[in-house]
Each structure stands twice: as C-alpha cells, then as structure tokens.
C-alpha cells in the first residue's frame, strides 16, 4: 500500500488492524492508542497546552492558544515536526522557524485562511475566509 499519516488522533475507535496494509504508516501524536502501535514510525508531538497554535471553533472562528506547560521528553509542536518533515522531502522549501511563520504558510496555501494573520487573530480570533470552497467542511 501507500503512505498513511495520522496527526493527533488517538485512533481509539479504529480497528486493531488499522494501518497494517499501508506501505508506510506514520503516527504523530501525544498519546498512543492501540491502533497507533501498528505504525512504521511514531513521532511525538506536543499535546494540548504544550505549544502555541490555532484552532477553528464550532462557529468557524480561528483562535490562538498558548503554551501552558512544557511538553514531555522530545515532543515538539506539530507545526515544527511537519515543517521538518517537509524540508526532508523538499530541501528547497523555505524553513518555518516559529508558529507565526507556520500560520503564515497555512494562510498562503489554504483558501479558508486567506487574508488571516497570526497578529490579526488577536484575542478574539477571526472568521474563516468566505473563500472556503463549498463542501470543504470549513465553517
């Protein structure tokens, strides 16, 4: 099979054989559920409260969250791990050195985030762009 990458989902409801047919199964998470144990490679990422980042709430507003504690061991923010993986795949890719640059990269490549900036989110966040394609799941 092909490559399967799972980010952050503990796969608690997944079949115990989940991912076994993949040629390469990469799991990135802060907690490992039973199905994640089938992964070819596991990369630890910081969990909630262990990194700065953003989320989209149920009203479709993008909001920032801030690190409250240090992640355990060698876990790093998901944006950092993904940025390093992308640099390995494409060495010519520009380096992403902080969460603000990661958000800028997202906003420059994802229609739903067009026009948004880390600073512009402020304390109350901002709505996703009206440019979100129909059926994209963006609210």
Give the ranges of each region predicted by the language model:
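Long, compositionally biased stretches
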Residues: 115-139
């Amino acid at each position: 099979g092909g490559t399967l990458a799972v980010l952050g989902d503990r796969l608690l409801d997944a079949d115990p054989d989940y991912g076994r047919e993949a040629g390469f199964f990469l799991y990135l998470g802060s907690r490992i559920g039973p199905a994640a144990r089938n992964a070819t490679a596991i990369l630890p990422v910081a969990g909630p409260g262990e990194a700065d980042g953003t989320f989209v709430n149920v009203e479709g507003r993008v909001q920032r969250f801030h690190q409250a504690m240090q992640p355990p061991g060698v876990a790093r923010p998901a944006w950092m791990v993904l940025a390093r993986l992308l640099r390995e795949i494409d060495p010519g890719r520009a380096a992403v050195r902080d969460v603000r640059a990661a958000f800028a990269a997202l906003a420059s490549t994802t229609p739903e985030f067009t026009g948004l900036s880390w600073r512009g989110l402020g304390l109350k966040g901002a709505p996703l762009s009206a440019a979100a394609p129909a059926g994209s799941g963006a609210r």
